[in-house]
């Protein structure tokens, strides 16, 4: 019996995930995208989702609300929903995991998070990620990756994994700014540790566990994203540091004001506060970032 898989979002990570899952001959993969040319087969999303066993969400965070509205009336009650979306909802500041649990219940929701850069997956480099979900869902979803370059391990903290994805994007942006300022490896080590500490503190504000930060979903993904030439968060940080016009948007930059709004400015910790000041306050980046080292 084949696994009927639908990937929503044919961007970089959606396309890379499709290549990974195709390694398992038991997987039958369909793709839906807002661009009709990228859809396979060419069918409405509502129709495709009604004939799937596993739904993978690989869409930008700003599109998650609209996607849920489209599929929730048509998706099967036994379909598992796995999200790779790393962001925060714009209206009320909900995590992707919070929205999914609210609409579909906790037992069939999973968050796939870890160091799995799309470019490296496409090039055949091995990767490993956390599949944050219930025991039953993990038993059903994990075999999809059998024989592929991506291995998964279970994590019980769904909201923590989702929050880690949001926070690591913001801190990757900050570490990109530090790299653009050419602050050196010592400074990077200091700021990486500070980011880790702040993520652990902030995790409680997102219903997650501080220990989740020290998993593949947290520190593992943060290190990969903050140091890779393929990372949009890193690239955006470099542009901000050098006073260049932002030519593309990244999840870290988009999520930052939403996280600030959810937490409140008084609860901002030093590194996140510095990133907010530099990215959106247009303050002197070198002066502010060097202040973090004292």
Map each language-model feature to its residues.
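NAD(P)+-binding Rossmann beta1-loop-alpha1 motif at the extreme N-terminus of oxidoreductases
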Residues: 1-54
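Conserved active-site and cofactor/substrate-binding residues in soluble primary-metabolism enzymes
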Residues: 8, 12, 16, 62, ...
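Internal alpha-helical scaffold of NAD(P)-dependent oxidoreductase catalytic cores
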Residues: 74, 99-107, 126-212
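General beta-strand structural signal in soluble alpha/beta enzymes
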Residues: 83, 108-113, 152-156, 215, ...
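Rossmann-like NAD(P)(H) cofactor-binding subdomain of soluble oxidoreductases
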Residues: 17-18, 45-125, 141-143
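NAD(P)-dependent Rossmann-like dehydrogenase/reductase catalytic/cofactor-binding core
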Residues: 2, 175, 204-294
